[in-house]
Amino acid sequence: GGTGDQNPVHLMEIFHIDPTIQDYNRKWLALYEGVNRCNQAIRILKGSDYDKKETRIAEMRFLRAHFYFNLKIIYNQIPYFDESVSDPSAFASISNKEYTSDQLWEKILNDFKAAYEGLPDSQPDVARPCKMTARAYMAKVYLFQGKWQECATATDEVINSGKYQLLPD
């Protein structure tokens, strides 16, 4: 047992945030770099005539929601911006108090819902998200919101899809 030599990782896992530990700053930066890349990709894709445009936008919305989900559970009150913010100088003026906690969860959930609607049932590449991946993340958001029935409905859909199973004991 124990935390070994990775105490900052252990502290992050138990939500003991200490701003003097550089791992938290690196995590924050990496997640927001991911958000920004997704936003840039969405802006570019929206202006393209790429034949897989809608699927790729759904993938980017899934990834953006994934990054924001992690930001929300680690840091709680976070700045939120989407693809409509394209000027990097605007980032400094985005407040982490612009949205309530419930509003942030809804924004994250809306991206997962859009991903669920836009993603195919399966993907040719293993690492790409599919419809049930988005639905499973929706269940996680409902769980963090305390919306038990919605969580149960979402998880039942994933389980009953027949595509996934628990590993044997």
Predicted segments, located by residue:
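Short coil/linker segments at helix-helix boundaries
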Residues: 77-101
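Mature extracytoplasmic enzyme cores
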Residues: 110-111, 134
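Short, surface-exposed, charge-dense and proline/glycine-enriched linear segments
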Residues: 7-20, 80-86, 111, 148-160
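Extended, well-ordered alpha-helical segments in internal regulatory regions
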Residues: 67-76, 138-147
